[in-house]
Amino acid sequence: MITLSNKKNKLNEHKNSLCVTYPRTVNIIFGHYPYPEVIHSFLLEIKNNIDPEMENYTHVKGGMTNWHYFLKNDLFTNFMTYIINKHQTSHPDIFEYFLEKRTIREAWGNEVKSGDHLNPHIHNHIHGILYLTEGCDLILPDLNISITPHPGDYYM
């Protein structure tokens, strides 16, 4: 049995990641953003800013904001700050000096209604998703896993 001697140490925070190899290797960093009022604000931002020209434009066949809608948005900035602070000790290769080493090129929101769907696709770079509502499972067939998300859950 291992006991942590300094329980107030910042390194003792609960962090989650899963490394999956089937047939490729992917490290999935995940957690829960514990601010329901912010999740609700994200929902309203998306609902009120759907761009009709972006509908069905990506693999998500539903409503979408502009590709860059959230880049300068305080809700998104605060969410990213939370993610960086939460995971920089467990994943320094990604999150240490994140804002100095990396550029977030796009940050948008999707609205998926009944009858909308998602086409299978793959991401080759770091990407993430913050779930704002209950929905269907996130199925990753190339990793042979299925994820059941809840509002506030994020995956990178």
Walk through the language-model features, giving the residues of each.
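Catalytic core of non-heme Fe(II) oxygenases with the double-stranded beta-helix
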Residues: 97-156
